[in-house]
């Protein structure tokens, strides 16, 4: 075998077809796009379609799940609280509550309240009133002479049930 004898396998290379060049070619008029519809128009890309190749979002595995009962806490470290006290953005003499942390701009979000974490060092003697706290955070606050009061975030479950029952009553009344 010589280099000049090398050839591609039969059918490995396919000539390109010029479409839309008259009905005699067999690929005229609609050019192999069928009749009307999104795929017949120009400038359209089907989202996520990669020309028949398995798309990236389908190649990657599914992972995890959304826990309907999971708690959503805004987390704050005691080191950051100390920085805000030093910068006079938080008053170290008053109780530090969720509202105080939000007003100071230390936390955002967290529909189930604020959770205190133990990263950093706390020098000020402060009382925290939060929805949750880690063991390390509680130890660090008590070591500095302060205290942590854990109050679970108020869950207006009865309000949710009342709203649901009212909605159901309205739906039944509308159906009748």
UniProtKB/Swiss-Prot annotation:
Keywords: Ribonucleoprotein, Ribosomal protein, RNA-binding, rRNA-binding. The keyword Metal-binding does not apply. It comes from Erythrobacter litoralis (strain HTCC2594). The gene is rplO. Residues 1-13, 156-176 have a biased composition (Basic and acidic residues). This is Large ribosomal subunit protein uL15. One of its GO terms (cellular component) is cytosolic large ribosomal subunit. The lineage of its organism: Bacteria, Pseudomonadati, Pseudomonadota, Alphaproteobacteria, Sphingomonadales. Residues 1-48, 151-176 are annotated as: Disordered. Part of the 50S ribosomal subunit. PANTHER family: 50S RIBOSOMAL PROTEIN L15, LARGE RIBOSOMAL SUBUNIT PROTEIN UL15M.
């Amino acid at each position: 075998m010589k280099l000049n004898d090398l050839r591609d396998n039969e059918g490995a290379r396919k000539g390109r077809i010029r479409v839309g060049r008259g009905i005699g070619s067999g690929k005229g008029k609609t050019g192999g796009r069928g009749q009307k519809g999104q795929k017949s128009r120009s400038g359209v890309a089907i989202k996520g379609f990669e020309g028949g190749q398995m798309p990236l979002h389908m190649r990657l595995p599914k992972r995890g799940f959304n826990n309907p009962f999971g708690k959503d806490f805004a987390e704050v470290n005691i080191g950051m609280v100390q920085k805000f006290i030093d910068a006079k953005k938080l008053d170290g003499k008053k109780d530090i509550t969720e509202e105080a942390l939000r007003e100071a701009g230390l936390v955002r979000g967290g529909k189930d309240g604020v959770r205190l974490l133990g990263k950093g060092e706390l020098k000020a003697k402060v009382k925290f009133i939060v929805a949750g706290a880690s063991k390390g955070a509680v130890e660090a606050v008590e070591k500095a002479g302060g205290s942590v009061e854990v109050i679970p975030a108020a869950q207006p479950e009865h309000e949710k049930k009342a709203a649901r029952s009212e909605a159901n009553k309205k739906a039944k009344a509308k159906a009748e």
